[in-house]
Amino acid sequence: MSTKRIVVIGGSAAGPKAAAKARRMDQHAEITIVQKGPDLSMASCGYPYYVGGTFDDRNQLICTPTGVVRDPMFFMNAKGITALTNTAATALDRQNRTVSCRNVETGEEQSLAYDKLILATGATPLMPPVPGIDLEGITNLQSMRDADYLRKVRDEKR
């Protein structure tokens, strides 16, 4: 019996949950999460509290309830799941069942074969075409990077 290969594109919230569920359903599967950004399994509902200063440690947004940071090492050690951060999925070949990926920092490219593919890419905010939308300080709050930026702006204004 061959090992099932599962690729999950997206590492914010739904992707890691889907990967963990896949692990519970198949202890022998080769599971890989592909995440474009540097962070995994973020508690995005906590972004406003971090930006507002309710807590200062951004790692609280990516920690387990026991305080362990959910990084690639955590996913490998705790769940046997490979997590590729800073890696963008650039193309899907459904016929050959492969995902082409590129590391956004190094430019290194690789191809991941899959038997099952899970798309959990989340949402992309739409910035409406209104006057002033391109002014400095106008942003959205969707990612850890956005939360860090807003926190910095808040701190500079004090």
Predicted ranges, named:
Residues 2-7, 69-158:
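FAD-binding core/adjacent interface of flavoenzyme oxidoreductases
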Residues 2-84:
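Beta1-alpha1 glycine-rich phosphate/pyrophosphate-binding loop at the start
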